Structures are given as C-alpha cells and as structure tokens.
Design a protein with these regions (language model features):
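C-terminal cap of metal-dependent C-N hydrolases
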Residues: 174-180, 185-186, 201, 250-298
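Divalent metal-coordination and catalytic microenvironments
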Residues: 2, 40, 101, 147, ...
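Short, solvent-exposed cationic patches
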Residues: 298-310
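Divalent metal-binding pocket/active-site signature
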Residues: 1-55
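Generic beta-strand/beta-sheet core signal
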Residues: 9, 38-42, 69-71, 101-103, ...
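Beta-strand segments within the central parallel beta-sheet cores of soluble alpha/beta enzyme folds
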Residues: 69-71, 102, 155, 220-224, ...
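Acidic, glycine-enriched loop/beta-strand segments at the rims
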Residues: 162-173, 217-222, 230-267
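Active-site neighborhoods of metal-dependent hydrolases
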Residues: 1-13, 18, 27, 60, ...
C-alpha cells in the first residue's frame, strides 16, 4: 500500500495488551520492504529503561529501524533520568538503527486517565464530551467547583483529553541537545483547547531554545527539524536546500522568530515566519494562509534508506 512502516502506542489500550513477541512478528513483515517502526513506548516513567530495552529488542529481532517517539522522562520520580536514558540510546545506536524525537515542552498531552495523573504537578483539560465547557481549565479548579477530589472529578469528565505537566526542564533540554534527536510536535489537532505544541513547537526551538537559551546554534536547530528527519525517515530529495530537491522552504527572521502559543491561549501563530513553501508553492505569506494545498502523501517506493544521507 506504500506505507512507510507502522507505529505502536504500547502505553495505550488496546496496544498495551500486545506482548513484545507480537510486535516483533509484525516488525518482521517490514524487513523486506525497508519499513520502520515508530513507538510511543510502553512506559516513559518508572520503567523507562525496560521500555527502551523492549524497543531495542524489537528492532534487533525484526531487523528493522526503530524510532522512539517524543522521548521523555515522565513523573517527578524520574526527573533527571535522561542522563541515564541517552547513554543507553547512544550505545544501542552503535549496534542497530535507532532514532528519536522530542518536543520542547515540560507537559505532554493525551487522553485524560484518572489512573495516570499521579506523576503530574498540574493537569489541564483539553476537551470533555460530557462537560465541553471545561476545556482549557485546570482540573484542580474544576474539582473544587464540583466539590470532589481531582480523581473523582476526572471520572466525571470522561471521555476527555488533558495536558499533563510531568517533565523537568533539564530533561527536555538535555534530550533536545542530544545530537541525534529530531524535533517533532506530537500535536493533536482535534482537541478543543490543544497543547500549544501544535502551533509553537518549531518556532519555540528556533527562537527560545536556540536564540534565547543558546542550547545549540541556529543551524543545528534547523537540521534537527529538517535534514535529520529526512534522513531518519528516508525522505528522498527533501530536508535540505539543494538544486533538484523538492522546494519545501520556510523563510523566517532569526532575530524575531518565536512561538506565541501558550497553555492559556494555545492556538496562536508564531511571529517572524515570513513565507512557507511546500513543493514549490507558497502556503503561508504575509501573515496568512494562501489557500493553496500542494502537499501530498510520500509513499514507500519514493523513499531513501533510514540512517543514510539522501
């Protein structure tokens, strides 16, 4: 069908019921088709090293590339553990094909699950089917209004989505600074009041972490969100400015580019982005979308090879 590979969310039902061996067998079907496996690992908290080993094992035994989605160390008990996880990833990269991405925030976003709130210092509701009026509000405030403990209030809101403040800034910066990490948003566009990463991820890296914090040079920030991603996913003739390559171009002012989306007001466009071109046609110009839709699906037969320059 032209698929690049397959992804798993072993943290979530029903995928969490799948044993490692089942994922390995699925992965073996990708081997002869140059496919890859991306994963939201089974545990990004207390058992994160076990989950890393599971991910590496899937890649080794299926003989396929694996990409760790939005690598993080979640929960207060795990703050600082990126100093432990990154050397493990580095060692695995010397033996097999491993990639990873990261988003530039200390908060994650997914379904609201009362049983998985304990490691978060703050929970922000992004949507709720029975109580849509609470989208964008802190769970603690909602619970006080309801006269209920937060866990019981969360039950009343289900099904719902939430932002969880559960990471440490030191880990976010360390993972972003790691030479092999790609930048990705992990954005969820359907949420009523989404995580600001949907609008702010890439300008936040360029403006805040590169220019203001000095985490890495601008050129490295750009590489992490363009050329490195193209190499890791085998996107042939994309990711670099080169004669003959597809013209996917963002023109921005390095002195002013910055995210303006916040958790309080998450759907705000960045400043300093002058022009966005996709496949040679402008899609954003003069502060507004042009209405042109030149994007297209990239099928497997058009791809390059994971881990090699294209």
């Amino acid at each position: 069908a032209g698929a690049i590979g397959f992804s798993t969310g072993l943290f979530y039902p029903p995928s969490q019921a799948a044993p490692t061996e089942e994922v390995i067998e699925l992965g073996k079907a990708l081997h002869d088709h140059a496919g890859l496996h991306t994963t939201h690992m089974r545990d990004e908290a207390n058992h994160i090293t076990d989950s890393l080993e599971e991910t590496f094992r899937i890649g080794r035994e299926a003989d396929i590339p694996v990409v760790i989605s939005h690598h993080k160390c979640s929960g207060a008990d795990n703050h600082g553990r990126s100093a432990e996880t990154l050397p493990l990833i580095d060692a695995a990269m010397k033996k097999q094909r491993v990639g990873l991405d990261v988003y530039p925030y200390i908060a994650s976003s997914t379904m609201l699950n009362p049983q998985r709130m304990m490691g978060a210092s703050r929970v922000l509701v992004t949507w709720s089917v029975p109580h849509p009026e609470h989208a964008g509000r802190d769970l603690d405030d909602i619970a006080k209004e309801m006269g209920l403990p937060p866990l019981e209030a969360a039950e009343k809101l289900l099904p719902a989505g939430a932002v969880y403040f559960s990471m440490a800034e030191e880990d976010v910066q360390r993972i972003m600074q790691y030479p092999h990490s790609m930048i990705g948003s992990d954005g969820l566009p359907h949420d009523t009041r989404p995580h600001p990463r949907l609008w702010g991820t890439f300008p936040r890296v360029l403006g805040h972490y590169s220019r203001e914090v000095g985490l890495f040079p601008l050129e490295e920030a750009v590489r992490k969100m363009t050329g490195l991603s193209a190499i890791q996913f085998g996107l042939k003739d994309r990711g670099t400015l080169k004669v003959g390559h597809y013209a996917d171009i963002v023109m921005f002012d390095p002195a002013t580019v910055i995210d303006t989306a916040s958790f309080a007001d998450p759907m705000q466009p960045a400043t300093g982005i002058e022009l966005v071109i996709v496949n040679g046609r402008p899609v954003w110009r003069d502060g507004a979308v042009t209405g042109t839709r030149p994007g297209r699906a990239i099928r497997r037969q058009q791809l390059g090879t994971f881990g090699k320059a294209v």
